[in-house]
Each structure stands twice: as structure tokens, then as C-alpha cells.
Amino acid sequence: VDKVDYIENRNRWVAKDVPAFKEEPFMTSETDFISKINFELSYTRFPNSGTKQYMGTWADINKSYLEVLGEEIRGNNFLKKQVEELTAGKETPEDKIASIFWYVRSNIQWDGLIRKYPTHTMRKVIEDKKGSTAEINILLASMLEKANVKANPVLISTRDHGFVREATPVSSQFNTVVC
């Protein structure tokens, strides 16, 4: 297609006599307090390609994230033996959780990176003994699953990343995952 027709909307907003922004101690991200208008792309519809949604519902975000990470959590069968050793003699789920948690905490160092998706395999995280927030928490979730303990990763936004606005279901509001 050599030509695409489109509709362009131009808007202009002006704010007058806006007081200066003053940073306060213990404040979360300054972008949460500065007056602004945010725009999010809802969808695109190009000729011969249908409509692509970018903004859906919270359920869509949850489903999409769990589809991506589900394989990572359920996979990693190389962890099975290690988990069996860590949980040997542990009767309750709480004891299994504690054993696995302390193993991960004691053996995997945080590399300083805050991520919501792992960039390395869990095998590499174990070998290197370090990982991002996502890698450490997904490793924990994967090991818990191997011990037959349900693990639910949760997307969150750190204080510097800003508040999550419930009215705007977009995954860019989150910057890390915890388990």
C-alpha cells in the first residue's frame, strides 16, 4: 500500500500561573505530582491488517503477562532435583516456602536491575548466582511450583516509577514483579 488515509486531531492545552514544582522529602516519583495530560495509544487500524489493540483491560494485561511468564515458571525442569533436596522432610507448604525462599535469598544476588521480564534463563541465573528483580522472583516462583506450592507473580510499580492509575490499564505502569 503506497497511501494511507488518516484523521489527525490536534489539540492544544495551556496552563497559566502554574506554581513551581517543589520536591518534598520521601516523595514518590515527581511525575505523580506534576500537572500533565497523558495519552495512551488505544488501537491502530491499518488497511489490510485489521485492528490491533494496545489498551485493553486489567484482565487482558494479567492474561498476557502470565502467558509470557507461565512457560518460564512451569518449565525449568532442571530445578526439580534441587527443589526435592531443599524440601526433603518438609511437610507443610510453609516449610517448603521458607526453605526455597532462604535458598534463593542466600544464593542469588540482585544485579541492581529492576525488570518485569527476565532477560536471562533461570539456568543462567543459577549459574551466575545473580539476576534482576524479575529473574530472582521468577526463579522463586518456578522453584515453588516444582515443590507443588502455587506461586502468583504480581506486577508492581516501584516508588520511583510512580503510581498505578487504575483507570488506565496499560502494562507500562509497572516496572517489576514480585512473588
Regions found by a protein language model. Name each.
Residues 17, 129-130, 155-158:
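Short, flexible loop/turn elements at secondary-structure junctions
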Residues 95, 99, 117, 126, ...:
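Active-site-proximal cofactor/substrate-binding loop regions of enzyme domains
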Residues 92-96, 125-136, 170-171:
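Secondary-structure capping and boundary motifs in well-ordered enzyme cores
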Residues 111-131:
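Short, conserved helix/loop micro-motifs enriched in His/Cys and acidic residues
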